[in-house]
């Protein structure tokens, strides 16, 4: 996992970085969806999932068909609604800062909701209700704020993407 560091100016210079417990996967998918059509991103992400499940351990905690049984897989499935919601900006051709923030927040929320539903189905199937709140905190509540924060660096790319779309 490539950590995300935000430099902060503290009095103590030995700890001037704040590490975010997420990867650049979500912002990258959002950026690719803004640039390309959703069919291209769907295909690329589907190939990524197939590679991770059957060929090579490309996921965060490895790979293989056993990854289907982890709560993380639900959040990977949540990328599909994220792509659909972000692609609405391409369809409407209204890529601006306000629309991007609204659609970005909705997309991240939809991704987390998909992961929570997948997790809940697993909890019911395995009859392990005591793990639901733990998984909810670990995979959603603990990370959703950081995912929202990663929308702000992407704001710097909105104007160039908008110009690029007009040229095409």
Regions found by a protein language model. Name each.
Residues 38-43, 95-98, 132:
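Membrane-helix interface segments
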Residues 26, 30, 75-83, 148-151:
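Alpha-helical transmembrane segments of multi-pass membrane proteins
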Residues 1-42:
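Hydrophobic transmembrane alpha-helices
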Residues 1, 131-168:
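Alpha-helical transmembrane segments and their cytosolic interface
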Residues 15-24, 67-74, 134-143:
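Short aromatic-rich membrane-water interface segments that cap or initiate transmembrane helices
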Residues 1-4, 58, 62-119, 155-163, ...:
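Short helix-perturbing small/polar motifs within transmembrane alpha-helices
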Residues 4-16, 57-67, 124-134:
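Membrane-interface helix termini and inter-helical loops of multi-pass transporters
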Residues 41-56:
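Small-polar-interrupted transmembrane alpha-helices in polytopic inner-membrane proteins
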